[in-house]
């Protein structure tokens, strides 16, 4: 019975993780004028509990380690990045799903992308959404890195028009 419960819990968690990545097709990349080799993450749009959310988050991935070095001096500058993969996204507000425009980027061809969030938020909070990426840098083994961004979900508003 214990094995069944563990299997059920594991299946439930996996299903929910996969479910969070579906149903939000059609994000639109909308970036300001930027340098070609840079790191950029657009600001998020606030949501409200109980109100349908439909938002895009545009980004630009780096082509080399130069912009990474500018933010993290421990990363050596001057190395080409041959591939970047979005591995996971955690702490997405309950009720929201997400879907990226793509999960694997070849910086020689494509560094711009977006993630679409949609659904009806169930909980109010400022969510620190974590993103895990894996980068293949020149001849080095693949490197995993993570970063966070905030998404604010406001409490539901109520009106008292009838009293």
Describe these PLM feature segments.
Residues 1-26:
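Bacterial Sec-dependent N-terminal signal peptides
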Residues 26-31, 132-133, 140-162:
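C-terminal edge beta-strand
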Residues 39-43, 99-104, 116:
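Short structured motifs
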Residues 46, 56-60, 116-120, 130, ...:
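Generic structural detector for well-ordered beta-strands
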Residues 115-139:
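A short beta-strand micro-motif common to beta-rich folds, especially ectodomain repeats
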Residues 31-71:
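Extracellular ectodomain surface segments
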Residues 62-106:
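Surface-exposed or secretory-pathway low-complexity segments enriched in glycine-proline
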Residues 108-116:
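Aromatic sugar-binding surface patches on proteins
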């Amino acid at each position: 019975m214990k094995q069944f419960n563990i299997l059920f819990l594991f299946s439930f968690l996996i299903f929910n993780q996969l479910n969070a990545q579906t149903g939000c097709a059609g994000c639109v990349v909308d970036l300001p004028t930027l340098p070609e080799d840079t790191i950029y993450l657009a600001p998020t749009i606030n949501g409200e509990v109980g109100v349908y959310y439909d938002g895009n988050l545009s980004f630009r991935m780096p082509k080399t380690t130069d912009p990474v070095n500018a933010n993290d001096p421990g990363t050596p500058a001057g190395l080409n990045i041959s591939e970047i993969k979005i591995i996971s996204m955690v702490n997405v507000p309950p009720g929201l799903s997400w879907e990226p425009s793509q999960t694997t980027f070849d910086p020689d061809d494509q560094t711009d992308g977006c993630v679409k969030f949609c659904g009806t938020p169930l909980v109010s909070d400022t969510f620190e959404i974590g993103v895990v990426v894996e980068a293949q840098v020149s001849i080095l083994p693949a490197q995993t890195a993570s970063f966070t961004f905030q998404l604010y979900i406001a409490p539901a508003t109520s009106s008292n028009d009838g009293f």
